[in-house]
Amino acid sequence: SAQAAKTSKREFRAAWIQCVNGQFQGLSKDDMQRTLSYQLDELQKDGANAIIFQVRAECDALYRSSYEPWSKFLTGRQGQDPGWDPLAWMIAECHKRGMELHAWINPYRAKTKTTSALAPNHIAVLHPERVFSYDGQYILNPALAVNREYICKVVDDIVRRYDVDGLHIDDYFYP
């Protein structure tokens, strides 16, 4: 509405779009873009002015990362290049609609219960000593300075290379 547009810079009316639920897994580029376009259009109609897009669910990436493998939540196989960059596309689509795009990362979760195979360049494969297992998941040990520094590198990579309007660090999966 016109009123929503007037207050869009004073009110943060955001919606979270997650990948970890598998809604995109195995979709073609066109189908995923069609799904996301529909979601963005509906959220815009509802007055949302920001999208919080999950780009790192398990030390993987829904963007062309300098550090981590492509997410299995895109193609069904971790490390498989989907042939496009969902984060770059989402930034363009959100900005075209006058919406902000905030990148959402899960900093320490390294493997969900549903992931059976990790890519060869995954942190848990390269440095298993930096990860612990708990309840079927792998978690980067937050007590290790090297892991905290690694997450800072990942964040720096995102904010330097992408025109994100914000960054959300979200995790509540610790034992």
Identify what each model region corresponds to.
Residues 10-34, 103, 107-162:
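Active-site-adjacent "subsite" loops/lids of carbohydrate-active enzymes
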Residues 27-46, 73-97, 149:
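Aromatic- and glycine-enriched glycan-recognition loops and surfaces
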Residues 46-82:
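Aromatic-lined carbohydrate-binding/catalytic grooves of carbohydrate-active enzymes
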